[in-house]
């Protein structure tokens, strides 16, 4: 008789992989995801008509505005492609909707608590808000592009007439909605979070070129060794530091503080380990504080580039630029403040306390209601004293390295990119594990049904043999 393994048994990597390969629906979803990501990358490297790329100044690091939106947009900004603005306007709209969906605007707060219908309305409003963001960002990119003659922009337009500018703005805005459509399709019919995977594809596509550029820059460091040995040793240290930061970021991203939860009427539980728990991540705010801080610091510097050489421009470049110690310090302060602020919005202790009270759940030793809210808030503040400084260190490392070494920001370690890489990969692996677990349960159910049928047939045959002992000899 076939034995059925327990569904509680954990699958190893080989078993998960074999289970997924046997799942036809999953393989179709995986192929769809890969095809859409390839389509996104192909369209991201094809410039729009009439674009002239200035290879001599093609430097992602020449402007913080370019660097941030090229990262969030999916890497299409360098070529001024259809996806030049990418999904960064949609991300900005999502962040604003999250902020407004708190108690700031009660109608939006009600929509958040209205289930699937409310979620769809929130998504529709988010896409409407995306439009002005896309138009403004596309216009800003075009303005920088048309001023490429100053040497501050890596791109320029062959024709800067008003009709061409309008065409580019409309095309890049349409590209934003097309990128959002691709991301939604991956999320619904593919594997993983589509928006995150689009951003990840842009970052990974630039990694090889970034490593080569870093090797070339590091080979120029003057050491009393041969140039080849100097470059090899420097790049080995660089790559090793990259891996260390990658693993450290993964550890902090996965680290959680578990708050035990008990259901009313469940009775006393002797061991807290057996209770369900509320997981609060050490880095509950994710990458959003870094995006906020980068945006605030890059806006005045970008505007100053279009101003004449005045005292105000010198002040911005001397004190707000991320290439100066004062600018780096202000950037670090903003990241810490936004980490505490946004993590509180993400967790929302008040809403959690109300939901616990409505569902009859409570934290052992803590009274429901206001005491529960204060307890969750205290826990959140304590873990933020770990998560916020770590996030700040990761965010400022590129600028510190760039300040002390001749390594450009975009080639330095850490920053928004490494956090997005870790977050996207962790989400994708979680999606694979969930799919493998679901497939395993389906197989277990089928095997169990077959075993039940076989057992029923065996029992019926044994019953017949008991009632008529000679029936077995008739066959």
From Swiss-Prot:
Tree of life domain: Bacteria
A Gene Ontology term for the protein's cellular component: plasma membrane
Transmembrane segments: 26-46, 65-87, 128-148, 163-183, 194-214, 232-252, 284-304, 325-345, 385-405, 411-431
Pfam family, one: SecY
Main localisation: membrane
Compartments it resides in: Cell membrane
Keyword NAD carried by entry: no
Membrane topology: Multi-pass membrane protein
Keywords assigned by UniProt, alphabetized: Cell membrane, Membrane, Protein transport, Translocation, Transmembrane, Transmembrane helix, Transport
Gene3D superfamilies: SecY subunit domain
One GO term (biological process): SRP-dependent cotranslational protein targeting to membrane, translocation
GO molecular function: protein transmembrane transporter activity; signal sequence binding
Function comment: The central subunit of the protein translocation channel SecYEG. Consists of two halves formed by TMs 1-5 and 6-10. These two domains form a lateral gate at the front which open onto the bilayer between TMs 2 and 7, and are clamped together by SecE at the back. The channel is closed by both a pore ring composed of hydrophobic SecY resides and a short helix (helix 2A) on the extracellular side of the membrane which forms a plug. The plug probably moves laterally to allow the channel to open. The ring and the pore may move independently.
NCBIfam families associated with the record: 3a0501s007 (TIGR00967)
Subunit-structure text: Component of the Sec protein translocase complex. Heterotrimer consisting of SecY, SecE and SecG subunits. The heterotrimers can form oligomers, although 1 heterotrimer is thought to be able to translocate proteins. Interacts with the ribosome. Interacts with SecDF, and other proteins may be involved. Interacts with SecA.
Family to which the UniProt record says this protein belongs: Belongs to the SecY/SEC61-alpha family.
Protein name: Protein translocase subunit SecY
Native source species: Mycoplasma genitalium (strain ATCC 33530 / DSM 19775 / NCTC 10195 / G37)
